[in-house]
Amino acid sequence: MARIFGTDGVRGVANADLTPELAFALGRAGAAVLTAAGDPNKPIVVGRDTRLSGTMLEAAVVAGIASTGRDTLSVGVVPTPGVARITALVEAAAGVMISASHNPIEDNGIKFFGPDGFKLSDAQERAIEAAVENPAGLPRATHRDVGIARAAHGLSDRYFATLVEGGADLSSLTVVVDAAFGAAYAVGPRAFARLGAAVDAIHAQDDGARINVACGSTDLSTLAARVCELAAQRPDAHVLGVAFDGDADRALFVDETGATIDGDCVMLVLAREKKRRGALCGDTVVGTVMSNIGLERALRTEGIALARAAVGDRYVLERLRADGLTFGGEQSGHIIDLERNTTGDGPGTAVALLSIVARERTTLRELVSALHVAPQILLNVRVARKDVLEGAAVREAIARVERELGVDGRILVRQSGTEPLIRVMIEGDDRARIDRLANDVAETVRLAAQ
């Protein structure tokens, strides 16, 4: 059976790949699989981002769920972490988010959460796929047993309350918020304003025709320009910026000079603060194989270890849970803090980071100054075969680079999960050296692929 789920739920072009028929089937199968052994009276929470196709797919998913006899609570436009949090807070049977995150406007997606607010395991996803493929045994309610769809937009306030709880007084800050015309268009600016910040919101409308278009965490240029403009106009103000993606499960930042503060920088600041108050479980942060070696070095000076997972917040979360840890993330801005939520939470991350800036009465630039980002070279080699990395010549080329770099750098050569590419990444302090080494390895891969 072909896989329906990808690395983060089901995604595709709305009404082409991800049709209402498939959405209905997923709603029906998901409800049956995830609630088979639970309380039959517990509803399923459903949320969405601002995409134009969101209401169409929401209606189909809700219909599929209702056909099994399960009620739904539609919370409207809310960030993905909001659906996860609300699902757990109201003790729902499950949660569903309709979003394609940072993908283009024509795409959409469906992801499920268990009653605890965590994303599904591979086994649960396969069970749903099997039920979509063979729905004969699924329940089909009739008469008074058909599920009822209820609007419950007010439940988004439960998520909002968790955002501002424990946040610092931000009245010393001017925060430019780029909401990407997405799910955080309301809750993001509102949270910072509630905590006292002067808020300048851009791309903060419910506009699914422009979600992620030249804005948000995938394009920081407008945000950086606005931060610099306000900083020049208000020299006595402390201006900084935060950008979310379409479903606000990630956040990136811009400091007072317009420089980008990525997820590695954020992890350093938050992990350091957690360790100081004794709240960093295992004194370990889970990053990914793409986390810069500069982060590893900076954490080490704080007595913090860096464990590495595969690329993707799904794999960061798996490593956290497997190792009994609570904090990790990615360069892309997915930060998972199991003290606060069960998934990446852009607004939650932003409140936590800006609270540290305000409490320590410092600048974002100063907070991340301990992280010296090592130069990184990333080359992509197009290949037709998937066994290229198994060849002796490629393995020896990688080993040779590892010996030459020693503790002063690292190499990662991996197959792309989405394209016919081999990615060659080398980090080190000498840019000319790592450029030479990366090109040598890439050429070896090219020859081996012929």
Describe the predicted segments one by one:
Residues 13, 108-236:
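Gly/Ser/Thr-enriched, mixed-charge loops and adjacent short helices
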Residues 32, 36, 40-107, 161-162, ...:
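N-terminal small/polar loop signature for handling phosphorylated ligands or for N-terminal nucleophile
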Residues 1-63, 67-68, 149-175:
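An N-terminal, well-structured beta->alpha segment
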Residues 119-121, 201-205, 259-278, 345-356, ...:
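Gly/Ser/Thr-rich active-site loops/lids in small-molecule metabolic enzymes
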Residues 5-6, 46, 72-77, 97-98, ...:
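General beta-strand structural signal in soluble alpha/beta enzymes
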Residues 81-82, 126-161, 165, 256-329, ...:
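Proline/glycine-rich low-complexity loops and linkers
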Residues 39-49, 73, 174-177, 283-289, ...:
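Short glycine-rich phosphate-binding loop at a beta-alpha junction
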Residues 240, 277-450:
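Phosphate-binding and adjacent anionic-ligand microenvironments
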